[in-house]
Structures are given as C-alpha cells and as structure tokens.
C-alpha cells in the first residue's frame, strides 16, 4: 500500500553528484508532487563507492545551497543536508536562521498546512522536527557515533578513526572521553580556513570529507569556497 495511505510520514534521500547537481529543481518539484514530509540531501564523501569522479566542485556546492535554500522556503516539505555543514553558513549569510523552529507538527502522513512558509531548520539545527525525532544538530563525533557490525567504534560512518571496540570498551566512555571525539567537538582545534572562519562553531566543515581528502580530520573543509572575513564568531 502507498505509505501516505497508511498515514506514514515519508522521507526521501538523495545523493548529490556531478550527474544530478543541475537537476535539484526538477527533483524538488517531483518530490512536491508526492507529498513527502522530508527531503534529506547527502553530499558525497569520497570513500567507498563515493568515488572521486562523482564529487562536485566547491562552486557547485554554493549553487546547490542556493537552490536548496530556495526550496526550503517554498516547498511544503522540510529540507535537510548531510555532510554539508557549510549549508548552515549559507543560510545565515542569506538572512535565514538555521536555528529557526519548523512549521507546526502535522498529523502522521497528512499534507502540510497550505501557506505555511516558516523557515525550515538547516543542517545542524538543534530544533526537533517533532518530539520523536532526534535533533538535527549532529556531526562527526558530536551527537553521533558509529558502531560497526563487528563492534568497532568510530566517530561516524564516513570517518574511519577507530576509537574502541564494543563490548570491551564502553560506548559512553568512548563518546565522552576518547581524544578523537573530544577533538572533533572542539572548533578551536580546526585548521586552515575552517580554524579562522567566523562560522566555525555553527559549521566547522565536514570532518569526514577533510579526512578522506587530506588524511587529517581537523583540516579545512576541502569543498568550501567561503573566505573568512575576520568577524566575530557566530
């Protein structure tokens, strides 16, 4: 049966690559016609099957952010990004508020209220979409950890820094006290332009992408075009 007929809220996940980065508007329109509740947009980290040749250019991120922010304001469904924390910086630069509350909760599977144009929370917002949903304010080692099927503990699925092994190691202790987790949660340890950026606390760049490209999880986000302006830290 159609999920909507069962009053289930539907989320659609899309990976942005060189093949579809120029089709964001078309995809957004298609999803609008399907009455979904959430569009989750994933930006590639060049590991595993996320091969380098599918990775978009830094300037294409900005173009993608512009279209996603447009649809976040216009569509009835919410939009969030994964592995693109610099989308929060884009939203702030363009007058949005990544911490803004979403529209009032709809009943399960119901179409959103017509005319609802509240600012949607961008990636990283700590606001809940509902009391049953985990907050969006998570990142590598910050609000999330990954435990493999064989017990290896990592800061995230795309950040293969081995920090322990369950059940020998307590996942709580690893999360709270392992040096890698503590480092990832400290924006003052960021390097390069990320370390100098006034958006380092609200953004901080993709630590998984930095590690995949440079081998250093605290290196600058390799796919960001923003040049820090030396202003106060946001």
What are the residue ranges of the model-derived segments?
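Radical SAM enzyme [4Fe-4S]-AdoMet core and its adjacent flexible, acidic
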Residues: 1-140, 146-150, 158-162
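Flexible mid-to-C-terminal extensions adjoining Fe-S/redox cofactors in radical SAM and related proteins
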Residues: 110-115, 152-153, 157-234
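Short, basic and Ser/Thr-rich N-terminal targeting/leader segments
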Residues: 140-141, 202
């Amino acid at each position: 049966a159609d999920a909507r007929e069962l009053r289930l809220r539907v989320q659609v996940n899309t990976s942005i690559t060189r093949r579809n980065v120029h089709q964001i508007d078309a995809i957004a329109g298609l999803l609008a016609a399907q009455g979904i509740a959430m569009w989750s947009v994933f930006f590639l980290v060049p590991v595993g099957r996320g091969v380098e040749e599918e990775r978009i250019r830094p300037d294409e991120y900005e173009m993608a952010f512009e279209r996603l922010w447009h649809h976040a304001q216009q569509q009835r469904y919410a939009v969030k990004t994964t592995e693109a924390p610099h989308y929060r910086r884009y939203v702030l630069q363009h007058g949005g508020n990544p911490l803004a509350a979403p529209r009032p909760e709809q009943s399960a599977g119901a179409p959103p209220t017509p005319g609802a144009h509240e600012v949607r929370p961008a990636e990283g917002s700590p606001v809940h979409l509902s009391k049953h949903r985990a907050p969006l304010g998570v990142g590598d080692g910050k609000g999330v950890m990954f435990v493999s099927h064989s017990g290896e503990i990592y800061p995230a699925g795309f950040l293969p820094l081995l920090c322990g092994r369950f059940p020998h190691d307590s996942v709580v202790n690893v999360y709270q006290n392992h040096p890698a987790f503590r480092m990832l949660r400290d924006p003052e340890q960021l390097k390069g332009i990320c370390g100098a950026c006034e958006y380092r606390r609200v953004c901080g760049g993709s630590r998984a992408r930095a590690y995949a490209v440079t081998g250093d999880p605290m290196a600058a986000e390799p796919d960001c075009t923003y040049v820090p302006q030396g202003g106060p830290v946001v």
